[in-house]
Amino acid sequence: IVRYIYKGVKAMKPWVKVSTCPVGKYRDTSRYPSRGWNAFFTVYQDPQGWMGEGIMDQIYPMMYFQGNNFYPFALDWQEQSNGRQVVPGLGIYFLHPDEGKWTRDEIDRQMNFIRSQKMAGEGHYRVKYLMENTQGIYDELAENFYAYPALQPPMPWLDNVPPTAPSELKVTDINNGYTELKWQAATDHDSRNNPLYVIYASNEFPVDTNRPENIVAQGVRETSYIYAPILPWNAKKHFAVTAIDRCGNESAAVQK
């Protein structure tokens, strides 16, 4: 069934991510046992097999555990991912006293571990507890972990060719401290995978497009953009524009 669905989706829209939310432990690992409840033997899921065969793009394992029930199994997912994207789901609902006795430090440790292993991200279950800022988790994420924008991780197993770069960037100061950017479009002609644009701004030239704090907009469809800084006295002086396709491949930048 999984193979049939994957091939059907890719035949119609190759850039669409096929993903699944498996049980948090695949099976026993050499580091720690799953203690009888796992994806492979208990509920008959084989997400590591699907990733190995190349018929799954992302997995979101439900890893609502602590300590040895979390770290060995998170590492196992990443090691057996075949380069696909692993996004562990974290049990932030345990921060609420009616659900458990976790502290925010537990979530911090898990997120730092995920980043140290270069996984594709993390999910938070349930969003109710995130939006209610349980134990300050929303503020913590906004101030520290998610302080800057992020681009989608690329999917090189589907397409690893970046779009051509936009060109002829023009920067014009207009009224009220706003700045207008205009550029020539990337010259790719795949109507099913037209690139979008990412705008970067900095006081340093050239603008470093590897620094997420320099991203001011993404998903821009047009070949123009009005830069309107929240604090006019903190407006940036230099700009860069890149093209990005549906598979997350980013072009070189045109700078001004």
Regions found by a protein language model. Give the residues of each.
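An aromatic-rich alpha-helical recognition segment common to small helix-rich domains
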Residues: 166, 181-185, 199-200, 227, ...
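Short S/T/G- and acidic-enriched coil/turn segments that sit immediately N-terminal to beta-strands
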Residues: 221-227
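Substrate-binding cleft of secreted/luminal carbohydrate-active enzymes
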Residues: 47-70, 84-158
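Beta-strand-rich modules
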Residues: 227-250
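Glycoside hydrolase catalytic-domain groove-lining segments
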Residues: 1-31, 37-98
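Pro/Thr/Ser/Gly-rich low-complexity, intrinsically disordered linker/stalk tracts
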Residues: 136-192, 233, 247-256
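Solvent-exposed loop/turn segments flanking beta-strands in beta-repeat/beta-sandwich domains
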Residues: 186-212, 236
